């Protein structure tokens, strides 16, 4: 189920004639094998989820399976700016559309990274990635007998609370809600950037029934940023652990064309970036992922560079 990164995306510019620190990420990244006993000391670890089977099940457009390596290529040439270490754990493949096995493999890899003291940043792949990442984080907390509160922050145009099965990119947070209920644990879910035009009344009803906190895209613009950050900071202060997942289709299509479902309105990039920084600087962010980047529909690699920028913000 684990596959190597293809065609070595970790290549970039060497500024041999310049004076001073010209180190770029491709110069510091190291591969990480799941069998290694290395202790990671909080270092970020990239993990690809090369899967769009859930997107296809959700009647979306194929192509997100190629997202992880495209984001790596965009990251490779980014200046390291003092980042001491970066690891790459390769990609999880989805073979023959077997989404469930791919999600279990992802969960195992996330758990492995966390158990070794790393910070997993998962590169999707469709938003079905969230079910795998959450399972891996939950398994890690269980192994430590840690019953602290876990806050899920999802920046997304969609609730992804569909109750239909088989599971898809539209069901991960319903699956998480059901798992929390079975375990007798709270389902602390905040969804930021919800589009009223992309979610049916049934999905809003489901969100209300589950006690989901959400903010619509019209209230996630730059003029609202200070209020949103204050509200989110209060939520983070009241929890023990944070899982951040960013569905890139929350961004306006002018900024993020490379997704299955481009947003006509969307949440501005500066707002998304500030939320990511708030989560990272809280000291409570345990895992994060970037979902739905689809290079097949990108324009001039703009979406890849935007995804890489958000990834870079989460690395340090």
From Swiss-Prot:
One of its GO terms (biological process) is L-histidine catabolic process to glutamate and formate. Mn(2+) 1 binds at residues 127, 156, 160, 247. InterPro entries: HutG (IPR005923), Ureohydrolase (IPR006035), Ureohydrolase_dom_sf (IPR023696), Ureohydrolase_Mn_BS (IPR020855). Its cofactor is Mn(2+). It holds the Pfam family Arginase. Pathway: Amino-acid degradation; L-histidine degradation into L-glutamate; L-glutamate from N-formimidoyl-L-glutamate (hydrolase route): step 1/1. Its EC number is 3.5.3.8. The keyword Manganese applies. Binds 2 manganese ions per subunit. One of its GO terms (molecular function) is manganese ion binding. Keywords: Histidine metabolism, Hydrolase, Manganese, Metal-binding. SUPFAM superfamilies: Arginase/deacetylase (SSF52768). Catalyzes the conversion of N-formimidoyl-L-glutamate to L-glutamate and formamide. Belongs to the arginase family. This is Formimidoylglutamase. The gene is hutG.
